[in-house]
Amino acid sequence: MAVVIRLARMGAKHEPKYRVTVADSRRYVTGKFLDILGTYIPSPKGNDKKIELDLAKVEEWIKKGAQPTDRVKHVIKLAQAK
C-alpha cells in the first residue's frame, strides 16, 4: 500500500479550505483516509494564510514511509517557518 500525504479540498465555492490527510494513493482525494494532520486555508483576498498542522504527526508519517505531495511539502515549510 503506497501511502501519501495530500490535500483534500473542503469549503465553499471561491473559498477553498484544505484538509491535510494521510491516505492510500489509490483512493479518491476526498475518500477514506488514515489520519488528519491539519488544515490549510489559503486566503484569496491577500490576508495571511492560516495553517494548522501537527508537525509531530507529519514527521511520524514520513518516517513510516508516507510521501508528501509537492504542495504539501510547501505547506509543511510554511508551517515550520511560523
From Swiss-Prot:
GO cellular component entries: cytoplasm; small ribosomal subunit
Lineage: Bacteria, Pseudomonadati, Bdellovibrionota, Bdellovibrionia, Bdellovibrionales
Domain of life: Bacteria
Keywords: Ribonucleoprotein, Ribosomal protein
Residue stretches in coiled coil: none
Gene Ontology MF term list: structural constituent of ribosome
Recorded family membership: Belongs to the bacterial ribosomal protein bS16 family.
Name the record gives this protein: Small ribosomal subunit protein bS16
A GO BP annotation: translation
InterPro entries noted in UniProt: Ribosomal_bS16, Ribosomal_bS16_CS, Ribosomal_bS16_dom_sf
Pfam (any one): Ribosomal_S16
Annotated source species: Bdellovibrio bacteriovorus (strain ATCC 15356 / DSM 50701 / NCIMB 9529 / HD100)
